């Protein structure tokens, strides 16, 4: 009886102890869950890279003094790194554009209404999500294509840039279709599809989860994009160096 009375008198302390134990257990559980989720996310990011991450570096810029000349400056730096030091150096940018031929394609617009639902571009189904890059990026990631497959071709005095399309559009966009970018006026020729390929987050490759490219487009920088300081400025902190290709 004394034991029972003691328990009843101290039930407040027991309750507090139970609550604290529950909180401690919950925090431990959430910590383990978050660590596992982070591990899984980092593994997904590692799987996107085909290069050795111990020898892969990101070129970072804390300050850009002259934005207007950035495109010219950064391209000169990348060329010097490649030519003088024989180091793979590539950058990419995820951008939104629109193709003249697709902006009036009912099937494409209907498909994109579902793809872009609940996003910033929900009211703009003609928008196309594009990954544009230096071909040297193919030394860092494996998307099932090679550098020569991204080489532009000339026909009738016009330059056509190879374009690879996410498999989600396979029934809408066909190989050898020609698409015209409404912003730069670039002409693209569809060369193939991206099957089960992932890519980095547009803001930060190492902080945010990867996403699939089922409804994205992949191509190389056009001449106009290479010289466009806005486009090149957006590649800041997405410029990669592969040191195992350097001269010893």
Where are these regions (language model features)?
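A short beta-strand structural signal in non-transmembrane regions
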Residues: 227-247
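Membrane-proximal extracellular/periplasmic loop immediately following the first transmembrane helix
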Residues: 31-135
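Polybasic, proline/glycine-rich intrinsically disordered low-complexity segments
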Residues: 71-79, 199-201, 210-231
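N-terminal Sec/SRP start-transfer signal
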Residues: 1-32
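Structural beta->alpha junctions
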Residues: 63-67, 195-197, 242-246
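Short hydrophobic beta-strand segments
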Residues: 57-62, 158-167, 239-241
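Flexible, charged surface loops at secondary-structure boundaries
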Residues: 51-53, 83, 154-159, 233-234
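Hydrophobic secondary-structure segments that place a key small or acidic residue at a functional site
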Residues: 121-219
């Amino acid at each position: 009886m004394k034991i029972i009375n003691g328990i009843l008198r101290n039930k407040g302390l027991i309750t507090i102890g139970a609550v604290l134990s529950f909180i401690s257990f919950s925090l431990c559980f959430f910590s383990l869950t978050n660590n596992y989720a982070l591990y899984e996310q980092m593994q997904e990011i590692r799987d996107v890279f085909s290069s050795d991450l111990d020898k892969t570096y990101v070129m970072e810029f804390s300050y850009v003094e002259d934005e207007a000349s950035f495109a010219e400056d950064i391209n000169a730096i990348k060329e010097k790194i490649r030519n003088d030091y024989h180091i793979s150096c590539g950058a990419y940018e995820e951008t939104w554009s629109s193709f003249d031929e697709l902006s009036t394609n009912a099937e494409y617009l209907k498909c994109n209404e579902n793809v872009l639902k609940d996003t910033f571009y929900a009211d703009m189904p003609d928008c196309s999500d594009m990954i544009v890059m230096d071909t040297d990026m193919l030394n860092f990631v494996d998307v099932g294509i090679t550098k020569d497959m991204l080489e532009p071709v000339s026909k009738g005095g016009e330059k056509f840039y190879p374009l690879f399309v996410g498999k989600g559009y396979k029934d809408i966009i066909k190989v050898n279709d020609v698409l015209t970018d409404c912003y730069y006026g670039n002409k693209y020729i569809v060369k193939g599809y991206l099957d089960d390929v992932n890519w980095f987050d547009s803001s930060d490759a190492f902080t945010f989860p990867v996403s699939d490219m089922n409804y994205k487009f992949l191509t190389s920088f056009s001449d106009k994009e290479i010289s466009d300081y806005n486009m090149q400025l957006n590649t800041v902190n997405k410029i990669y160096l592969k040191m195992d290709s350097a001269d010893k």
